[in-house]
Amino acid sequence: MAMTLRDIINKLLRRQPASASTARERLQLVLAHDRSDLSTELLDQMRKEILEVVAKYVEIDVDEGAVSLETEDRMTALVANLPIKRTITGQIQLKEPKNQSELDSPETEGTDQKS
């Protein structure tokens, strides 16, 4: 089957937005990475730790989830898109801080004190 000139033009025009969109997304990712001044190793460690913390509270689909840097209007954000399978109930009780000094104190990290 021979392609007409119109078919060729339509085919070419449909690919351009997809290619341009992909190139733009890649450029935004590179810019976000550069602006954040984070090494690849540090970003990977952050992703791992974020997934571990979220997994304490909800069951997530790690294979479908993503943690990425996104830039929009000169602002870089760390974005986590994590599909939740179900919540985990009754396993963890959160301790509310009594005052600001407890939030700032590294001594209270990892303690299991009850209010």
Curated annotation (Swiss-Prot):
Q: Return the HAMAP family for the record.
A: MinE (MF_00262)
InterPro entries attached to this UniProt entry: MinE, MinE_sf
| UniProt cross-references to Pfam families, sorted A to Z | MinE (PF03776)
- Function of the molecule: Prevents the cell division inhibition by proteins MinC and MinD at internal division sites while permitting inhibition at polar sites. This ensures cell division at the proper site by restricting the formation of a division septum at the midpoint of the long axis of the cell.
Keyword tags: Cell cycle, Cell division
Keyword hit for Cytoplasm = no
Task: Write the protein's name.
Answer: Cell division topological specificity factor
Which terms under GO biological process does the entry name?
Answer: cell division; regulation of division septum assembly
Species, as recorded: Prochlorococcus marinus (strain NATL1A)
Q: Where is the composition biased (Acidic residues)?
A: 104-115
Question: Can you tell me which family this protein belongs to?
Answer: Belongs to the MinE family.
Region annotated Disordered, chain positions: 93-115
